[in-house]
């Protein structure tokens, strides 16, 4: 099974399940979120595909593709608090063996920043010992981005940071996402 560790609410999420039935015949592929079935593919029944309502799961049927060796589902309209969870692909074979194999991936859903953070207040060069005063603002995200400072690709130890103030506020027009500003 392939699935993202973190899925972005700004994009659809794709889940893939590949399997080798060897000499056995595929009976069904089922997809679950938190032990609730939301999708079923059964190649020998009509209809082949069945979808079931599960909170936080919205299937994009045009992104679904299943056959005898793989099953891909595409989920859309992800939300952080409802689409997070344990996603499982379960594959079963026909009689007489009725073998069952499953794999689960925990997926975190977040709204990732669409842009790089903006830093203002810097000058072109600094000499050793100079004081640096700058402001870093992240673009909206949920949860709020964690601001980490680097100089010459080296992370700055927080004991050398004097944080003047930090603001974290909700941008209602952006769907309740958070923007963080750090003044140092």
Question: What annotation goes with each model-predicted range?
Answer:
Residues 1, 32-37, 104-122, 151-157:
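Flexible inter-domain hinge/linker segments at boundaries of tandem extracellular adhesion modules
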Residues 1-8, 120-126, 138-139:
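Short beta-strand segments of immunoglobulin-like
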Residues 8-9, 80-81, 128:
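Surface-exposed loops/turns
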Residues 12, 16-18, 28, 58-106:
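Ligand-binding face of N-terminal immunoglobulin V-set domains in extracellular IgSF glycoproteins
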Residues 22-58, 142-163:
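N-terminal V-set
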Residues 53-59, 63-74, 168-184:
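Aromatic sugar-binding surface patches on proteins
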Residues 134-149, 156, 165-184:
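Extended serine/threonine-enriched, polar tracts that run as long, contiguous segments within proteins
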């Amino acid at each position: 099974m392939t699935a993202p560790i973190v899925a972005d609410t700004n994009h659809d999420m794709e889940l893939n399940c590949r399997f080798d039935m060897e000499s056995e015949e595929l009976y069904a592929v089922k997809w679950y979120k938190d032990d609730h079935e939301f999708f079923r593919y059964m190649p020998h029944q009509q209809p082949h595909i069945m979808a079931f309502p599960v909170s936080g799961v919205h299937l994009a049927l045009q992104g679904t593709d299943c056959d005898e060796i793989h099953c891909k589902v595409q989920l859309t309209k992800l939300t952080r608090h409802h689409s997070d969870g344990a996603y499982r692909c379960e594959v079963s074979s026909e009689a007489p063996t009725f073998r069952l194999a499953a794999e689960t991936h925990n997926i975190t859903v977040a709204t990732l920043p669409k842009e790089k953070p903006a830093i203002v207040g810097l000058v072109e060069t600094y000499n050793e010992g100079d004081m640096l005063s700058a402001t870093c603002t992240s673009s909206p995200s949920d949860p709020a981005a964690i601001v980490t400072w680097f100089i010459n690709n080296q992370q700055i130890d927080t004991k050398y940071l004097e944080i003047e103030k930090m603001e974290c506020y909700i941008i209602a027009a952006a769907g309740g996402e958070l923007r963080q500003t750090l003044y140092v």
